[in-house]
Swiss-Prot record:
This is ATP-dependent Clp protease proteolytic subunit. It is an enzyme of class 3 (hydrolase). Cleaves peptides in various proteins in a process that requires ATP hydrolysis. Has a chymotrypsin-like activity. Plays a major role in the degradation of misfolded proteins. Fourteen ClpP subunits assemble into 2 heptameric rings which stack back to back to give a disk-like structure with a central cavity, resembling the structure of eukaryotic proteasomes. SUPFAM superfamilies: ClpP/crotonase.
Length: 204
């Protein structure tokens, strides 16, 4: 078995009693009924498609009820992350974000992109922002130049998004993302990436 198969085999099943008898769900499907989506692991195209599909499904179920996005991610693909971000902004329901563990790179951008006043971290979460990474490019000098220009445009776009959601000016964002900038939950709150640090569930 590969890692994905092992991980899937370890996902718990929940059995519910209904008028029609028993029904079993994997734990994530059961939580989806409560409008909870998990964004866990590397941000890549397949995972992004699943998150986008869940956001659209929950909007179709009830366009006026909040969706809760739990994030534990080291980041990943910028384009995949932006597809999730754009969908969060596009749909009608507010998307509340919660960092559990870590939200780094694109994970941090998605955390900050939650609905205003509804962005949270658990106390021992870590958040990290940085500029988009340019992998080991190969090819002609002209191709490398094209990709270098694209990465600069992406950097500007991501800085603008972070500035919009944090209230920090572009110059501050550009300086702070020039290298990896790590923050604990309180620092992330002070920076404007989140609104509150939660150590207990707020009832009601």
């Amino acid at each position: 078995m590969n890692k994905l198969e092992i991980a899937n085999a370890l996902v718990p099943m929940v059995v519910e009693q209904t008028a029609r008898g028993e029904r079993s769900y994997d734990i994530y499907s059961r939580l989806l009924k409560e409008r909870i989506i998990f964004l866990v692991g590397q941000v890549e195209d397949h995972m992004a498609n699943l998150v986008v599909a869940q956001l659209l499904f929950l909007e179709s179920e009830n366009p006026d009820k909040d969706i809760h996005l739990y994030i534990n991610s080291p980041g990943g693909s910028v384009t995949a992350g932006l597809s999730i971000y754009d969908t969060m902004q596009f749909i009608k329901p507010d998307v509340s974000t919660m960092c559990i563990g870590q939200a780094a790179s694109m994970g941090a951008l998605l955390l900050s992109g939650g609905a205003a006043g509804k962005r949270y971290c658990l106390p021992h979460s870590r958040v990290m922002i940085h500029q988009p990474l340019l992998g080991g490019l190969q090819g002609q000098a002209s191709d490398i130049e094209i990709h270098a220009k694209e990465i600069l445009l992406l950097r500007e776009k991501l800085n603008n998004i972070l500035s919009k959601h944090t209230g920090q000016d572009i110059e501050t964002i550009a300086r702070d993302t020039d290298r990896d900038k790590f923050m604990d939950a309180e620092m992330a709150k002070n920076y404007g990436l989140i609104d509150s640090v939660l150590d207990k569930r707020v009832v009601g």
